[in-house]
Amino acid sequence: MARPNKFLLWFCCFAWLCFPISLGSQASGGEAQIAASAELESGAMPWSLLQHIDERDRAGLLPALFKVLSVGRGGSPRLQPDSRALHYMKKLYKTYATKEGIPKSNRSHLYNTVRLFTPCTRHKQAPGDQVTGILPSVELLFNLDRITTVEHLLKSVLLYNINNSVSFSSAVKCVCNLMIKEPKSSSRTLGRAPYSFTFNSQFEFGKKHKWIQIDVTSLLQPLVASNKRSIHMSINFTCMKDQLEHPSAQNGLFNMTLVSPSLILYLNDTSAQAYHSWYSLHYKRRPSQGPDQERSLSAYPVGEEAAEDGRSSHHRHRRGQETVSSELKKPLGPASFNLSEYFRQFLLPQNECELHDFRLSFSQLKWDNWIVAPHRYNPRYCKGDCPRAVGHRYGSPVHTMVQNIIYEKLDSSVPRPSCVPAKYSPLSVLTIEPDGSIAYKEYEDMIATKCTCR
């Protein structure tokens, strides 16, 4: 029995020694497979490289734009929106944001999100009548699943586009009748709400008038607030020319065609990653900042004076000279004093902590098929060495100086202060959603505007 036991022991040892070798060969083969697949998918979006990051760490590592916009990205192709609706949202983007994507400071509205939905289905109920001025009535179904629970509706409008170019010398009075149809499976609570609304509006068309907006906030606000995401409505128009002002009009008749409307929702995104308009005062009131902040090293993303950097660098150089001259007036130390080392510790480092540009195009990431605007993005980043005596020039707290002393005098394992962003500006983004809707959103903390040492 001794020999079989001894043989079994040797066999187990041999298998244990061989196991790492086979495992290593399998691992190397797996790495080769991954490398080959990476070459085949070299055109894939950079987000795919980050899928293995733990969900708890992802929030701290990824900027809000890449984190939020990549949610819900699937393999199915995106539906393309109506060209007229896309043109309208591009004009809206130019009104709200600069070419670089920064929200304009003269804004007065409270919403930070605008969503445009086109109807999923369109059914004509009855033909129009040119004699009576009745336009063809239609039934529309809007799918609002893209609205999240943190988005609160502030305003909603139906946007009509006039199909053919019309020019009227007189005012055109239109009466719109709109009725919401509730599905059979709806709850009783929603059934009690009024679902039939009649809008009496007077529209005046000019030579270049192409759009009609009908405010339906009072109708949709309770529905969206109750998480109703499927809106089925019936709409018809009756339009006539003003006979009193222009009696020569031929019985008030005209030929006008309205394309099926889009639904625009103006929302306030209350999440932390969204830009909130009341914070815009923080960017407007630069003169009211404290003296310490005014002396800090800063850079502004767009539209600021180019001479600001020159003046700040001049002041930094002058303050550095004053510091060195004041230190030279002090009595000299021991004979072993090294003058060059003494100068070096007070002069600013050559690679000073400051802002750097990093301009990228969304076409480089192959995201330009769904990010409509801006075309380019400059997040900027902070890089450089932090001086030993940071003082208040960077807006750094006293703790930064204490950390420097600990690093130099007590424990070198304690890291030195790092060059990091201190302030940011928001970014406006216009995107095409997977369902073909169009979204304008404003994201907080997307562009670094100031560096500090911490």
Curated annotation (Swiss-Prot):
It comes from the Eukaryota. SMART domains: TGFB (SM00204). Changing R146C: In POF14; uncertain significance. InterPro entries: Cystine-knot_cytokine, Growth_differentiation_fac-9_C, TGF-b_C, TGF-beta-rel, TGFb_CS. Residues 25-319 form a propeptide. Residues 303-330 are annotated as: Disordered. One of its GO terms (cellular component) is extracellular space. Its main location: secreted. Keywords: Cleavage on pair of basic residues, Cytokine, Disulfide bond, Glycoprotein, Growth factor, Phosphoprotein, Premature ovarian failure, Secreted, Signal. Glycans are attached at N106, N163, N236, N255, N268, N338. Expressed in ovarian granulosa cells. Present in oocytes of primary follicles (at protein level). Residues 1-24 form the signal peptide. GO terms for biological process: female gamete generation; negative regulation of cell growth; oocyte growth; positive regulation of cell population proliferation; regulation of progesterone secretion; transforming growth factor beta receptor signaling pathway. Changing R454C: Found at higher frequency in mothers of dizygotic twins than in controls. Disulfide bonds join C353-C419, C382-C451, C386-C453. Changing T238A: In POF14; uncertain significance. Pfam families: TGF_beta (PF00019). One of its GO terms (molecular function) is cytokine activity. It is found in: Secreted. Transmembrane segments: none annotated. Required for ovarian folliculogenesis. Promotes primordial follicle development. Stimulates granulosa cell proliferation. Promotes cell transition from G0/G1 to S and G2/M phases, through an increase of CCND1 and CCNE1 expression, and RB1 phosphorylation. It regulates STAR expression and cAMP-dependent progesterone release in granulosa and thecal cells. Attenuates the suppressive effects of activin A on STAR expression and progesterone production by increasing the expression of inhibin B. It suppresses FST and FSTL3 production in granulosa-lutein cells. It is linked to Altered GDF9 function may be involved in ovarian disorders and contribute to the likelihood of dizygotic twinning. PANTHER family: GROWTH_DIFFERENTIATION FACTOR 9, TGF-BETA FAMILY. Homodimer or heterodimer (Potential). But, in contrast to other members of this family, cannot be disulfide-linked. Ovarian physiology and fertility are controlled by endocrine and paracrine signals. These act in a species-dependent manner and determine the ovulation quota in different mammalian species. While humans, and mammals such as the cow or red deer, normally ovulate only one egg per cycle, other mammals such as mouse and pig can ovulate in excess of ten per cycle. The mechanisms that regulate the species-specific differences in the number of follicles that go onto ovulate during each reproductive cycle are poorly understood. This is Growth/differentiation factor 9.
